[in-house]
From Swiss-Prot:
Disulfide bonds listed in the record: none
Species of the source: Schizosaccharomyces japonicus (strain yFS275 / FY16936) (Fission yeast)
Gene3D superfamilies to which the protein is assigned, alphabetical: translation initiation factor eif-2b, domain 1, Translation initiation factor eif-2b, domain 2
Sequence similarity: Belongs to the eIF-2B alpha/beta/delta subunits family. MtnA subfamily.
Gene designation: mri1
Protein name per the record: Methylthioribose-1-phosphate isomerase
Length: 356
């Protein structure tokens, strides 16, 4: 059974605090829109699909007990607030738009019913879509590379912790592993928040998938033995330009140089057809402390872990200026394919054409 980042049952919602992983499991109850805003903003929950799901379910949970004569305005204002938490991940904006349309189309108590149903459907749909992405992607990669066992490189975290379960890019890797087609998976540490070392490495170990953790800067030296690079996406523009975790662009350039397929995986929800290209993507910047500090359990004499004692350590000069973008944009011409639950999209004479 995969890790569960989002727990929703009987109108109660909680999320796994991913800032404490991999050493501590703690679920945070989400009882209000502000609770959801906080965990998304603080990256206690992250991953474009998971952000949208938590936002939608938080509004649904709050609707159960909210007392207001204007449910329509409550829903619209709630999603406007949640949209401010993370500006790059398109999934949140897509579900906010859909919920606005539902709120505008119904009256009174009907609004409460349809919004809750859509939030619950989103949770179930995401899990189904992830399994489809995994199957379509694994079939595509095996046919493209034409080897029985593959060595894969992935970046950031795109698994159960970033979605409702199974994952997108990591879903493809899971599907390959289920087919006995994984030789080894290399995952980058993914600075500055180390989602690769804290989360992806943890998921791979949890599923007993042969894996090795590397620093971000090691990628060039191992790229010649990589069969495919598989990453997720936070926003894909109409032309295929893809915003994803910072460092994705570097991997795409390396993959191009070494003639390694570079594959993007994500739900069709992540494709923003209103965005012509990646130049229009708003890139979120995080506080400099996320770059100049690290946090984790105390280790005595390099051997004894004190898991109950978590400390922050400053690893850079105190007054250094730090630039800490969360995402970069990979041009479409560096991407071999975009795998969604609808289809595997590859470039044609006119580039990427997303139609379903």
């Amino acid at each position: 059974m995969s890790l569960q980042a989002i727990v929703y049952e009987d109108n109660k919602l909680s999320v796994l605090d991913q800032l404490l992983l991999p050493h501590e499991h703690k679920y945070i109850p989400i009882k209000s829109v502000e609770d959801a805003y906080s965990v998304i903003k603080n990256m206690q929950v992250r991953g474009a699909p998971a952000i949208a799901i938590v936002a939608a379910l938080a509004v649904a949970v709050s609707l159960v007990n909210v007392k207001t004569d204007d449910l329509r305005n409550y829903v619209i204002e709630s999603f406007e607030r949640l949209k401010q938490s993370r500006p790059t991940a398109v999934n949140l904006f897509q579900i906010a738009y859909k919920m606005r349309k539902l709120a505008e189309a119904y009256e009174g108590e009907e609004i409460r019913v349809v919004v809750v149903k859509e939030a619950e459907d989103l949770l179930a749909r995401d899990l189904r879509d992830n399994h489809t992405i995994g199957e379509l992607g694994s079939e595509y990669v095996l046919k493209l590379v034409n080897k029985p066992r593959l060595t894969i490189l992935t970046h950031c975290n795109t698994g159960s912790l970033a979605t409702s379960g199974y994952g997108t890019a990591l879903g493809i890797i899971r599907s390959l592993n289920e087919k006995g087609a994984i030789e080894r998976v290399y995952c980058t540490e993914t600075r500055p928040n180390n989602q690769g070392s804290r989360l992806t490495a943890y998921e791979l170990l949890y599923d007993n998938i042969a894996s090795t953790l590397i620093t971000d800067s090691t990628a060039a030296s191992i790229m010649p033995k990589i069969d495919a690079v598989i990453v997720g996406c936070d926003r894909v523009a109409r032309n295929g330009d893809t915003a994803n975790k910072i460092g994705t662009l570097s991997l795409a350039i390396l993959a191009k140089h070494f003639n390694v397929p570079f594959i993007v995986a994500g739900p069709s929800f992540s494709i923003d057809m209103t965005l012509p290209d990646g130049e229009q993507t708003k890139i979120e910047e995080r506080p400099s402390r996320e770059l100049v500090m690290v946090r984790g359990p105390v280790v005595r004499d390099f051997t004894t872990h004190q898991f109950g004692a978590r400390e922050s350590v400053h690893i850079a000069p105190i007054n250094v200026k730090a630039y800490c973008p969360v995402f970069d944009v990979t041009p479409a011409d560096l991407i071999s394919a975009v795998v969604t639950e609808k289809a595997v999209f590859t470039k044609g004479p006119n580039g990427y054409e997303f139609k379903w």
